[in-house]
Regions:
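N-terminal nucleotide/polyanion-binding subdomain common to many enzyme families
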Residues: 1-77
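S-adenosyl-L-methionine/SAH cofactor-binding core of RNA-modifying enzymes
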Residues: 63-104
Length: 104
């Protein structure tokens, strides 16, 4: 099973991946994990990946373009069929049942 993690904070993952139960699965070659920095797909010189919300309001949102381009580049890296899961506040809660469905 392969996981490609798309993130703005790739430096957060090596410690976790090398110390957890996931590390044992990686060492036993049951799982592969690749971490991808979404900023690599940003188009401007500052590698900006966030923007103000459409229609105004407080806070920032992640631009869709770098995320889509990253997905389009990462999915073909593995010949196996891919399931793409995008995490959003409005989505379904990722629970054990969903994880088991995705593992099939």
């Amino acid at each position: 099973m392969r996981f490609d993690v798309l993130t703005l904070f790739p430096d957060m993952f090596p410690g976790y991946l090398s110390q957890s139960l996931l590390n044992k699965a990686i060492e036993q070659q049951l799982v592969e994990v690749a971490v991808h920095d979404i900023r690599r797909w940003a188009k401007d010189k500052h590698q900006s990946v966030d923007d103000r919300p459409f229609g105004g309001g407080p806070g920032m949102v992640i631009k869709v373009e770098p995320v889509v381009e990253c997905i389009e580049d990462v999915v073909p890296l593995d010949a196996r069929p891919a399931t793409v899961a995008l995490m959003t506040p409005q989505g379904r809660r990722l629970d054990q049942t969903i994880v088991e469905e995705l593992a099939q």
